[in-house]
Regions:
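Transmembrane beta-strands of outer-membrane beta-barrel pores
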Residues: 3, 25-29, 61-67, 99-103, ...
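Hydrophobic, lipid-facing positions within transmembrane beta-strands of outer-membrane proteins
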Residues: 3-7, 23, 41-45, 77-81, ...
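Repeated loop/turn-to-beta-strand initiation elements of outer-membrane beta-barrel proteins
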Residues: 15-21, 53-59, 89-95, 130-140
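Outer-membrane beta-barrel proteins
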Residues: 28-34, 56, 66-72, 102-108, ...
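Outer-membrane beta-barrel transmembrane domain signature
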Residues: 90-125, 131
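Outer-membrane beta-barrel "beta-signal"
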Residues: 128-131, 137, 141, 155-167
């Protein structure tokens, strides 16, 4: 059995500052006597600040718990800081930096939960988008992510381009 309960609020503090917050609890109970229950608090907080009509900044922090029916679970804490700027009426740019940590737990062995490796994750990216017409937009961007864990480290580069049409 898996249960999660969460309460939250969102709102505008002023015309330039808005945000949201959530607080919850998640629990996974198992029918097996060899697997003990897994539970944790889950939270998220977000703040958006409009500096002016062209520029805005955002910050999000999220703690998530993901149990599985087989006894594995992940508990992650992720943060993201972002900025957006409208260069012209039709061109917008954005950038972000993200960071996080993920802890993995294996199913219990001999009645006790076993901790596995954890990882730290970092990312950054930027994008540029243009509204070509009322129905067509185009965008491009670059994302880099770096995974740091005990079994090895690696980075990933992604370059993307897209055209979207609405009919």
């Amino acid at each position: 059995q898996s249960h999660t309960i969460s309460f939250g609020a969102q709102g505008d503090y002023s015309s330039k500052l808005s945000g949201n917050a959530n607080l919850g609890y998640s629990v996974q109970n198992y029918d097996s006597a060899t697997l003990s229950k897994q539970d944790n608090l889950v939270t998220s907080v977000g703040v958006n600040w409009k500096l002016n009509t062209k520029t805005s900044f955002g910050f999000d922090l999220n703690r998530a718990f993901s149990p599985s029916a087989q006894g594995f679970s992940t508990f992650s804490t992720m943060g993201r800081a972002s900025a957006s700027h409208r260069i012209t009426e039709k061109i917008t740019s954005g950038a972000y930096f993200s960071f996080g940590t993920v802890s993995y737990t294996y199913p219990p062995s001999g009645g006790a939960a076993r901790d596995s490796n954890s990882l730290n994750q970092y990312g950054l990216g930027f994008n540029l988008s243009k509204q070509i017409s009322d129905r067509i937009s185009a965008g491009t961007g670059y994302d880099y992510s770096f995974i740091d864990q005990s079994t090895g480290n690696y980075g990933r580069h992604v370059i993307r381009a897209d055209v979207t049409g609405r009919f």
